[in-house]
Amino acid sequence: MKLHHFASPALALLLSATLPIHAADPVVANVVSAQQAGTKLVDITFDVSDADSDTLSMSVEISDDSGTSFLVPVTALSGDTSVSATPTPTSKALVWDASVDFNQQFNSTMVVRVIAADGASPKPPPAGMVLIPAGPFEMGQTGIAIPVHTVMVSAFYLDQFEVTKALWDDVKTWGAANGYTDLPAGRGQGSFHPVQDINWYAAVKWCNARSEKEGLTPVYHTDAGQGTVYRTENINLGKNFVNWSANGFRLATEAEWEKAARGTLVGNTYPWGNSITGADANYYASGDPFEPGASPGTTPVGYYDGDQVPAGANRANGYGLYDMSGNLWEWCWDLYDGSYYGSSPATDPRGPTSTPFVARVLRGGSWVSRTDDLRCAYRSGGTPVPGIGAFGFRSARGL
């Protein structure tokens, strides 16, 4: 199991946060790197802790393109490469001899990544979900969603596909007999098409129902005391109505959604790259066989797997997610505020506490969208009700 933190010589402390992949992961923080004057030696200091008091193997990855890729070889590393960690953070140090591996000047475009490995293996993701690893990413895009800013996101799971009509119906049927009496029927062009006509409240309640059906702890409650599970009615939930540490299903936050959509790429416009055609995603007049005449519609989830029409490549992104662009707009947890990026937290932002009017974030675009709406950074919001034929969702889970 690994935990990554980043530092830059230009920014003495770029990122410092605790990012658990599970309860006993090692934690690296306060990474600082600086070149020793007159040499090609780079000092790297950091704090490290581990709840299990494991012996950790420390390693370093280095980028010479501002973090886009980490391809600089790092073999000449000395210092605290093996650490007997304790639950209390301890200061440690490494020295990289760049003259051996790089033999160029350490400069402001270089980013250092410190990795602590305890030898543990991550548990497999729940069925139908993928692991989105902890780490930072650049959220936003110049000219689309500004300011572009670095966000640290903790690890979480996300559905590989948008929630299908079949899955919606299965949970809804269980819910109707277990206190979830007002979940709507929804609509879908087929069992394995995404469920449509889902409003935000229904998506949240359905996540709770799915949690209880699978024996997990529900996330959403009817008040800040979190004494009553949210099962019926339309309640404007505050952030303190949410048990963020629960293991049940929930909507992704806007930051989680964008990190997941970008996959393993950096600065990309779409989940697969920077251009789009009808072979990549379902949008207005994209040419798939599910849009006859003037009545376009959804494609089955995961349709763009290499066998789609028009012919194209498998468009699962780097995390294995499908339809993060197109098919249906996807509800996120956050209240929508067009100016939120100017004041959002750097770690695990969960949206503004209040807004002048109630709207929730929608991401990804849909079958009735133009291609601009399908960009990873594109932000939109909608009133929580009603659900319409372009709105759906996928569920997330914490670790």
Task: Please place each PLM-identified region on the residue numbering.
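A short glycine-rich, aromatic-capped structural motif
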Residues: 121-179, 194-212, 325-326, 395
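Proline/serine/threonine-rich low-complexity linkers at boundaries of modular beta-sandwich domains
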Residues: 20-27
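Bacterial N-terminal signal peptides
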Residues: 8-18
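Extracellular acidic, Ser/Thr/Pro-rich low-complexity tracts
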Residues: 47-52, 64, 100
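Short glycine/proline/serine/threonine-rich loop/turn segments at secondary-structure transition edges
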Residues: 102-110
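Functional-site microenvironments in short loops/helix caps that host divalent-cation chemistry
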Residues: 132, 138, 200-377
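Short, structured beta-strand segments at or near domain termini in extracellular proteins/domains
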Residues: 388-399
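Structural beta-strand segments of beta-rich domains
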Residues: 40-44
